[in-house]
Structure formats: structure tokens, C-alpha cells
Amino acid sequence: MIRPCFLVIDHEFPDSISTRKLVLETAKYNVITAYSANEAVATFRMFPNVSGIVMNEAVTGTDCGSLVNELRAIRSDILLIVTSSRGPTDCVVADHQLNNFDPAALLNLLRKLVPNPLEHYLSE
């Protein structure tokens, strides 16, 4: 079985992306990272078969809605979760919106939407 893989897009701040990455990798998900809108689009073109995208609504280089539309132009059915430190955002084109500071909510949502068949097996 193959573990699900996510593209995580965020600012290049200490701890911001590493926390999400650590949470996802601890749950046995694979993670690819991007630190700007341009890098996100280029990375998604290179790896269009990721299981989903987790992005910060204030990613550098563009506004949230524009980036979501650009990513969906590459693959229209991609699962897209937006996180924000301001709570619910105006990025309504995303599939789901979560608070930046609630990694448990992100993990619970991903476990529900994209179950990892290896998570239980690998944790034994």
C-alpha cells in the first residue's frame, strides 16, 4: 500500500511549516513542501498526483483565491485545505478552512477525508 502524500504550502517562518509537516509525518503521511505561490505551482505541476494540498491563506506571492484557482487549473479535483491565523477566511474556493493553530483539527480532518491504510500498521 502507498501512503497518502500532501503538498504543504506556507510562509518560510521558523516552526510554521515544520509543525504541520511534523504532525502529518508522525501520522505516517508523506509531505512535499513549498514556501511561495510560484514554488507551489511548480511543485504541483511536478507532483500532480498528491492526495491533497494544505496551504496557509496568506502564502507569499498571491492571494489565496488566485492560488487555489491556479492549482485547480492543474488538477480540478484536488482536495484543498486552507489554514489561517484569523479563523475562517474569505478563501471560499477551498474545500475546507481551519485555524492555523489547531494541528489536531487538521490531522482529524485528513484522517477522515484521506485515511492512511498504513497508519495503524506502522505504529505497532
What are these regions (language model features)?
Residues 10, 56, 79-85:
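Short beta-strand elements of ligand-binding domains
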Residues 9-11, 34, 53:
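Conserved sequence signature across two-component system core domains
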Residues 83-124:
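Output/docking surface of receiver
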Residues 2-3:
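Phosphate-coordination loops involved in phosphoryl transfer and adenosine-cofactor binding
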Residues 13-32:
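Two-component/phosphorelay signaling modules centered on CheY-like receiver
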Residues 39-42:
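Short alpha-helical segment
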Residues 37, 50-75:
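Conserved phosphotransfer microenvironments
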